[in-house]
Amino acid sequence: MDIPLLDEIDLEILMHRDAHFGGNFGIMIEYYENEGVGAMPDFELDRIEELQSIQEELGEDLSTKLLSMPAFEEIAKSKAIYSQLEEVYKHKNATIPILISDLILTEEEEPMEEITAIIKEGEKMVEPLIQLIDSSDFYNPLYPGYGRTPAFAAVCLDKIGDPKAIPHLFQALGGENLDLEEIFISSLVAFGTPAKTFLLKRLIGKPLNKDNLNAAVALAFFPTDEKIAKAAFKLLHDEDNLNNESFAPYLICLCEGLTTPEDQELFKELIKKPSFPKMLKLDGQTILHSWQ
């Protein structure tokens, strides 16, 4: 039979089937029926069942017919990571690798048992957790953990409280997954002053790059702070910063921490200038209202 035209989502379904479910549609369908934590929101159960029917009519594996060599390489990499994670359970005394494997392979929505076990081990877990944050593999839902592992690692790191994790959490910012972004920022906030000091250096760093923006975004979630506010206000006096549509709104937000009447009056004068961007007027007025 001719293979019906398949779209990109169909090919992704095949890749996920092969990576996570041993190439078995039946196992994948059961997993989706039970709403497993790794179920992809873009994959409809009806479509998975349709692909199973197409394969049965064809009498050949759809992946073999349709997937590219790079796709097979990605699947093979995912399977290899699964094998490595499962291998550690053969070594009963390998406490740290076992705890990390438990965290990655968990099927719990909120794996509090696994997280608690890691936190109890303390600082010896910091480096393995940082590796999870730094590895691009574990952000990929095709790989073990379904892309959830960095979030769990961040929670563990802020509970353990070793500040060496701060630069790694910061470097993880700026991704497309907004849920992950929120968790990373929450972890940075949990570190308190050490994280704030680190972020301030990135906020004022030169030349201007994505680090400045990511620092501003993260600092907006901290309690208002006069030192941060003064730094942000100073940055707003640079025309390039003021006209940066991504950066400037966060700088204005941070200015809420200006506490002296003198600084607040200078801020008021800034937003009244004819050269002040119109698109930022409302943001500026919001800060003024917050001081009333």
PLM segments and residue spans:
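Extended alpha-helical scaffolding segments
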Residues: E12-E50, A216-Q292
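Aromatic-residue detector
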Residues: E30-L45, I98-L99, L103, G145-Y146, ...
